[in-house]
Design a protein with these regions (language model features):
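Class I SAM-dependent methyltransferase "Motif I" SAM/SAH-binding loop
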Residues: 2-6, 111
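Conserved SAM-binding loop of SAM-dependent methyltransferases across substrates and taxa
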Residues: 5-18
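A short helix-to-beta-strand connector/capping loop
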Residues: 18, 41-44, 133
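Conserved SAM-binding motif I beta-strand of class I
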Residues: 19-24
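S-adenosyl-L-methionine
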Residues: 28-69
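Mobile active-site "lid"/loop adjacent to the S-adenosyl-L-methionine
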Residues: 29, 48, 65-95
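C-terminal catalytic and target-recognition region of SAM-dependent MTase-like enzymes
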Residues: 91, 105-186
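Helix-to-beta-strand junctions that scaffold the AdoMet/dcAdoMet cofactor pocket
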Residues: 100-102
Length: 186
């Protein structure tokens, strides 16, 4: 989702995926994505659709994918946009998590330098709770070493990519031994 010129979808097909669908609202980017797929001799379905609407449609119809990749454009370019970016990242990740088959993979990205990795992980934790799933994060990465960042400008560490398995939430994961339970009267 937010496929832009198709990099993730095309790479998935080249790596052996059975199918890939790229979703974006940018018609020019989708045209380029189609050309990129042709140049790489892979078949990818590209759709000019609002990502939020598409994910809502999927979950409404009970449709899920083995892998969902969320790579939106920068959502917070200035301090005034941070609160809205938190809500948007929360919404898109909740929907994305609901669209992943149990045990499937979610790759979610943020290129907003004003959203720290810690904040992004907090957003994902909240989104997982709202989606009724548990995330098992197995990799967190960012820009490669050709994108150095300064200690006095942490926003330069703008790219965050979180790879996680998505599992349905069951109370079993959070059962504590009886002597460790916390109650209102404790």
């Amino acid at each position: 989702c937010f496929c832009y010129t198709g990099g993730f979808a095309i790479s998935a097909m080249l790596a052996g995926a059975r199918s890939a669908t790229g979703i974006d609202l940018d018609e020019d980017a989708l045209e380029t994505a189609g050309e990129n797929a042709r140049l790489n001799s892979v078949k990818v379905t590209f759709q000019h659709v609002n990502v939020f609407d598409h994910l809502r449609m999927m979950t409404g119809k009970g449709m899920q994918s083995d892998v969902v990749i969320l790579d939106p454009a920068k959502l917070a370019g200035c301090a005034e946009e941070i609160k809205r970016a938190h809500r948007t990242y929360g919404d898109i990740n909740r929907l994305g998590m609901q669209a992943v088959k149990p045990g499937g993979i979610l790759l979610t990205c943020s290129c907003s330098g004003l959203i720290s990795e810690r904040d992004f992980l907090s957003i994902l934790t909240r989104s997982a709770a709202e989606a009724g799933v548990v995330l098992q994060i197995f990799k967190i990465t960012g820009a490669s070493s050709d994108h150095p960042f300064s200690t006095v400008f942490p926003e330069g560490r703008y790219l965050k990519a979180v790879f996680a398995r998505v599992f349905p939430f069951t109370k079993k994961e959070f059962n504590f031994p009886k002597n460790e339970r916390v109650t209102k009267n404790s």
